[in-house]
């Protein structure tokens, strides 16, 4: 029964994940959402959203339609190097789908994606996108949640724009380079150089202590950007990686045919391997170490439900 409980919780989480993806696409300016659907209020991580949507493609066909639309209209606002780095944390199937997405990006004229498109992408590029679906002329960088894309449009795609977006998303808190790197996935060296340049230009504040920390004053930036509020930062990448690895496992023969003991062991390994998804986002879930053997399955199902509830209120 415990395994059935996990499977049911996973399906509930899958529906929550699809809802989050649509709300974030709505926030970055696609007309993909259902009329009246609320957009995201937290900052959208563009590369993480692409990978998240690719992982969910078979569960929601419309996501592939909006992804191919983005490959033709908004791909210039994405970092190829960053998405390659983030993709390593997703199930293997996402790697192939990323190559398919990259093929469409190359067809739109962005040659940066050639290294990702692969030699066979043209022959196996996923379902044919439905051309009758209309998602708009291109990204609309209006909503507060689309701030990272807006900063990239203004400052260029790279560490400086994302560093500024991260600092604006933490409400004026002092942040170490290590913390910023955990959120943005840029190297400490790249972020240190970017932060020092921006501090010299007085775009960010640097502390006098060692190791140096950085912050911004949110109010002047909010006024400059003409935003009624600044969207909070969420650590989407580690959370999405946990979600997609978990759902891929629940769909696998390993889960379907395994004993409760083996399934509980794998569930424990998943949570431990992706613990940053919970600690960085402040999601309080049961500790795997507090349960023995198969008894963890019920706690794992609870972890999935808690994560789904957090998604609903935090997106």
PLM regions with names:
Residues 171-183:
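Short acidic, hydrophobic short linear motifs in intrinsically disordered regions
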Residues 134-165:
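Short alpha-helical segments that sit at the start of domains
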Residues 1-144, 229-315:
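Long, low-complexity, charge-rich intrinsically disordered regions
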Residues 179, 188-193, 227, 244:
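Elongated scaffolding segments in large macromolecular assemblies
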Residues 165-171:
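Short, locally clustered residues in the helix-turn-helix/winged-helix DNA-binding domain
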Residues 151-160, 208-230:
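Short, cationic-aromatic polyanion-contact patches
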Residues 185-201:
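Short amphipathic alpha-helical interaction segments
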Residues 199-209:
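A short, conserved structural fragment
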